[in-house]
Swiss-Prot record:
Transfers the 4'-phosphopantetheine moiety from coenzyme A to a Ser of acyl-carrier-protein. It comes from Roseiflexus castenholzii (strain DSM 13941 / HLO8). Belongs to the P-Pant transferase superfamily. AcpS family. This is Holo-[acyl-carrier-protein] synthase. Pfam families: ACPS. It catalyses: apo-[ACP] + CoA = holo-[ACP] + adenosine 3',5'-bisphosphate + H(+).
Length: 136
């Protein structure tokens, strides 16, 4: 089965949240690794916000604090980069449990930002019987 999730966010929305709440906002939403990867670039933070939303949609759940009590925590979905700089997803906690429940074998992620918008698309594949263990 194929699962998809997509999200788009105005970079200015994330910029305003950072200006208003500062490190409190950043630490609530993003992991230390995500923050380090963004080097303070609001566009990169916005793309990772969109990635978290896209993956949550792919999993069929919301983000806790956005999508209600049944959602996953922001830190349960981490949007990082592999050794070649390609976007990758690390799941933990409730997000990891939901992916296993769905039999997801892999998640692919694409991020972009331009003209004040950031977008992410996540695609996951599952099989009827798990072929291998996920890295998370």
């Amino acid at each position: 089965m194929i699962y998809t999730g997509i999200d788009i966010v105005a970079v200015d929305r994330i910029r305003r949240a950072v200006e208003r709440w500062g490190d409190r906002f950043i630490q609530r939403i993003f992991s230390t690794a995500e923050t380090a990867l963004c080097h303070g670039r609001t566009e990169s933070l916005a793309a990772r916000w969109a990635a978290k939303e896209a993956v949550a949609k792919l999993l069929g759940v919301g983000l806790r604090g956005i999508g209600g009590a049944g959602g996953v925590a922001f830190h349960d979905i981490e949007a990082l980069a592999d050794a070649h700089g390609r976007p990758m997803v690390i799941l933990r906690g409730a997000a990891q449990a939901r992916a296993r429940e769905l039999g997801i074998d892999s998640i692919r992620l694409s991020l972009s930002h331009d003209h004040g918008l950031a977008i992410a698309i996540a695609i996951a594949l599952s099989s009827p019987t798990p072929r291998r263990r996920m890295p998370w």
